[in-house]
C-alpha cells in the first residue's frame, strides 16, 4: 500500500475548492441565480420557482449554506435565505485573480 502524501494547500486553493464544490451542481447554481435575481431574502418560495422536490432543495440549500455562499435566518416557522454578497464577491475575486492570471500567462496549448 502506498504512503499517504501530506499536501499543504494554500488558503486560496482551499477556498476555490470549497466554492467549486458548492457550485458543482446545476441546481445549486440555479438557486444562487434565483436568490440574486430576487435581490432579497426568500422564505419558502424556492420550491415554487424551481422544478425540484422540497427535500432536494433543502439538501442543496444546506450545501450552499455550509460553503458560506448563502445565509439562512429563521423567520417564524420558516427559514429565509439570501446570498452572502461579501462571500460571493470574495469567491469572484479569488477566481478572477487565479484564473485571470493563468489565462494571461498562457501562450500556447498542445
Feature names for model-found ranges:
Residues 1-15, 37, 85-110:
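Amphipathic alpha-helical dimerization/coiled-coil segments
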Residues 14-53, 75-87:
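N-terminal helix-turn-helix DNA-binding core of bacterial DNA-binding proteins
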Residues 43-44, 73, 91, 107:
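Short, hydrophobic secondary-structure boundary micro-motifs
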Residues 48, 65-66:
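Alpha-helical residues within the helix-turn-helix
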Residues 61-62:
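Short, hydrophobic-biased segments on the C-terminal half of alpha helices
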